Design a protein with these regions (language model features):
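N-terminal regions that are enriched for targeting/export leaders
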Residues: 12-21
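Histidine-anchored, small-residue-rich loop motif
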Residues: 20, 25, 45, 168, ...
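Alpha-helical scaffold segments that form or flank carboxylate-/histidine-based iron centers
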Residues: 24-38, 61-86, 154-156, 161-169
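Low-complexity, Gly/Ser/Thr/Pro-rich intrinsically disordered linker/tail segments
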Residues: 199-207
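Single conserved hydrophobic/aromatic residue that forms the stacking wall/gate
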Residues: 1-7, 11
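Active/ligand-binding-proximal structured segments within catalytic/core domains
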Residues: 42
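All-alpha RGS (Regulator of G-protein Signaling) helical domain and cognate RGS-like helical scaffolds
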Residues: 37, 48-57, 69-142
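An amphipathic alpha-helical core segment
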Residues: 126-182, 188-199
Length: 207
């Protein structure tokens, strides 16, 4: 295997312990199942699918943008697994046991775009709840620098639309069913209030 492929398509260590998010509402059981089973499956399947193809030595982002909306079934499989791998990398990095206070530069940008932090949170939760079936809810920065809340189905992500992901929440049922059962609104609200590391989110925004 090429070293580039090993770097791009391999499960990363979590940036915190299995029980680090429990106090914030994500149990150790959820993190173990989600990271070690669901996320790992995307990586394993993705590596099998890109073996021997033009994407074998490509960067993860190149694979995603190059296979998005591809006609071939094999290409669709590559996209789904590569995109979900990327999505989960963002998901883990945007959470943490610290960073609950939103830095002033981020809160100012959010307030300027959405009216207030509370209004942003309400809109984010509404978008996540409104995503029918599996998918993701995002806070993105668009090419013109403005912020927007988007939702994407299945494994589609902001890279497909030339947007920068600042914050992403997994709304596939496996991400919340152990801890919240079918209460997706409660899961999304808790994600924003008790799981997001806003300091990490602020580092992603471009001036």
């Amino acid at each position: 295997e090429s070293t580039r492929r090993q770097r791009q398509m391999c499960i990363r260590d979590r940036p915190y312990a299995y029980d680090a998010l429990a106090a914030g509402g994500m149990s150790q059981e959820t993190l173990e199942f989600h990271h070690d089973l669901h996320h790992k499956a995307y990586v394993d399947n993705g590596n099998k699918l890109i073996a021997g193809t033009q994407w074998e030595n490509s960067a993860l982002e190149e694979i995603i943008t190059g296979t998005y909306q591809a006609d071939a079934v094999a290409q669709n499989g590559i996209f789904n697994n590569a995109s979900q791998h990327w999505n989960h990398i963002q998901f883990w990095e945007m959470m943490g046991p610290s960073g609950r206070e939103m830095p002033s530069e981020l809160s100012s940008a959010i307030t300027a775009q959405f009216g207030s932090v509370d209004a942003f949170k309400e809109a984010f939760v509404a978008a996540g709840v409104g995503q029918f079936g599996s998918g993701w809810c995002w806070l993105v920065q668009q090419a013109d620098g403005s912020l927007a809340i988007t939702k994407t189905e299945n494994g589609v992500n902001p890279l497909c639309f030339g947007q920068k992901a600042l914050l992403g929440c997994d709304v596939w049922e496996h991400s919340y069913y152990i801890d919240f059962r079918n209460k997706r609104p409660a899961y999304l609200t808790n994600f924003l209030d008790n799981l997001v590391n806003w300091e990490n989110v602020a580092l992603r925004i471009s001036g």
